[in-house]
Amino acid sequence: MKKLLLLVCAAVMSLSASAQAGDKALGAQLVFGSKTNSIGLGVKGQYYFTDQIRGEASFDYFFKNQGISMWDINANVHYLFDVADKFKVYPVAGLGYTNWSYTNDVIVIEENGNKRTTEFKGSNGRLAVNLGGGAEYALTDNVSVNAEAKWQIVNNYNQLVLGVGVAYKF
């Protein structure tokens, strides 16, 4: 399995193209949410409107921690600044929708003194404003790695989301 993964990575990295208006990219990311205190996985799609401006749609799922799981879907815009050969930084601005699901066991003490456990479930969804920044390093003309930090501003549930990922440009 490891040999197959290395072969696929080598094949992908050997392809070449340049980033310009109309280009697209697909990627995956590992994320961490400060409010949920959990890690998650995400997928993203990018479209280059110009050589410097790209839009990004992403979906992240944060694994359950202490009875809470979360997912978000985002639409962000990046303005790419060339800092050095193959290295770019960018601000992040956009909108998102976040959804939290929670499951907790609650111990109920009845009037007669008996105890019973009841499961308490629920979910909440809210719109978010995303603000942050990131950095990207091109491993090849098509493959890049990135690190990003964004603040999800959500009514009563602001969260810092940190992510690292890889993207393939085509």
Q: Can you describe what each PLM-predicted range is?
A:
Residues K115, G125-F170:
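A generic hydrophobic-segment detector
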Residues M1-D23:
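Cleavable N-terminal export/targeting peptides
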Residues G22-K35, R54-K64, S144-V154:
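Transmembrane beta-strand segments that form the barrel wall of outer-membrane beta-barrel proteins
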Residues Q46-N112, G122, R126, Y137-D141, ...:
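Gram-negative (and chloroplast) outer-membrane scaffold detector with strong preference
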Residues A21, T36-S38, T50, A84, ...:
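A cross-taxa feature marking solvent-exposed loop/turn segments within ectodomains of secreted
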Residues L26-L30, V43, G55-A57, A75, ...:
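Membrane-embedded beta-strand positions of outer-membrane beta-barrel proteins
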Residues G22-K24, N37-L41, S69-I73, F87, ...:
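Residues that define the transmembrane beta-barrel architecture of outer-membrane proteins
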Residues Q20-N37, T98-G125, G163:
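Outer-membrane pore/translocation modules
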